[in-house]
Every structure is written in C-alpha cells, then in structure tokens.
C-alpha cells in the first residue's frame, strides 16, 4: 500500500512514485523533468515573439512554447515553455527548447516528434508528448509569421 508524503514543493505524491519513475523512464527524461530547461514566458505582445499553445484532450497535457526570433536573420534567439502534464510532456518541452535555440525557423520546422521520442527513449504510450512538442513549435512559428506579416502590412 502506498502512503502519502508532502514534498518540499508542496505537491502531494504517493510515496514510491519517484522510484517507480526512475525505473520506467530513461535517465534523459528524468533529467529534463527534474531539471527542466528554459521554463518561463516571453512577452507575447512583442512582434518577434511567437506563441504556440497545444493540448492533448486524451490525457490533459497542455504545452505553451514561445520563441523569440531575430527578425533580420530568422534565427530563434530565445525560447521558453510552460507545460502542465506528465514527466514525459515536461521532458519533451524542455528538450525541444534546447533543440530549437539557435536554429533558423526553417530548420526548427523540420523537427519531428520521432527525433524527440528517440532522444528521450519515450515508450510508445508516451509518444503523444513528443507530438505535442512538435505541434507547439510549429504553432509558435506560425504565430510569429502571422504577427510579422501583420506588422509588414501596416
């Protein structure tokens, strides 16, 4: 029988779940989940910031990924995310932010969920998390381009 304990972050978890996760998830997932990179937000009002917000109704994961682009070069200078979901969703978001920083929009658009899933060794039941990350970067790029187009039309 699992007991409950309160962790330092005031989240109540069944005792033993972290040990279970460590046995079931690849160390890269554990690393990105426990030490997520680039968590935060960018000012969505800026014309060089694109925001992608996606969700998976089946499991309740929600992912927001934001990119800040150098308008003159089309290179992603900064990237932030906030994800509400399982460890695989958080790890996929965190890994995606590392992957796209410094890439051109064209190169970032080419990233497929299979690349994320392979790098993190996600099990088949967690592939939707890597799909969310792919959808989020594409949505952020689309948002950035629509903002830029609107600015150019003025």
Swiss-Prot record:
InterPro entries: ISCU, NIF_FeS_clus_asmbl_NifU_N. Binds 1 [2Fe-2S] cluster per subunit. Pathway: Cofactor biosynthesis; iron-sulfur cluster biosynthesis. Pfam families: NifU_N. Its cofactor is [2Fe-2S] cluster. The keyword Metal-binding applies. Keywords: 2Fe-2S, Iron, Iron-sulfur, Metal-binding, Mitochondrion, Transit peptide. This is Iron sulfur cluster assembly protein 1, mitochondrial. It comes from Eremothecium gossypii (strain ATCC 10895 / CBS 109.51 / FGSC 9923 / NRRL Y-1056). The gene is ISU1.
């Amino acid at each position: 029988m699992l007991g409950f304990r309160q962790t330092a972050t005031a989240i109540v978890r069944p005792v033993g779940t972290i040990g279970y996760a460590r046995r079931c998830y690849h160390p890269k997932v554990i690393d990105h989940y426990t030490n997520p990179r680039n968590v935060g937000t960018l000012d969505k009002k800026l014309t060089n910031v694109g925001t992608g917000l996606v969700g998976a109704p089946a499991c309740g994961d929600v992912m927001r990924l934001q990119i800040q682009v150098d308008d003159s070069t089309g290179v992603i200078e900064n990237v932030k995310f906030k994800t509400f979901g399982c460890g695989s969703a958080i790890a996929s978001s965190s890994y995606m932010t590392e992957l796209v920083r410094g890439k051109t929009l064209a190169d970032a658009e080419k990233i497929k969920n299979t690349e994320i899933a392979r790098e993190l060794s996600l099990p088949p039941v967690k592939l939707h998390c890597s799909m969310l990350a792919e959808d989020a970067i594409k949505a952020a790029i689309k948002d950035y381009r629509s903002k830029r187009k609107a600015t150019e039309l003025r």
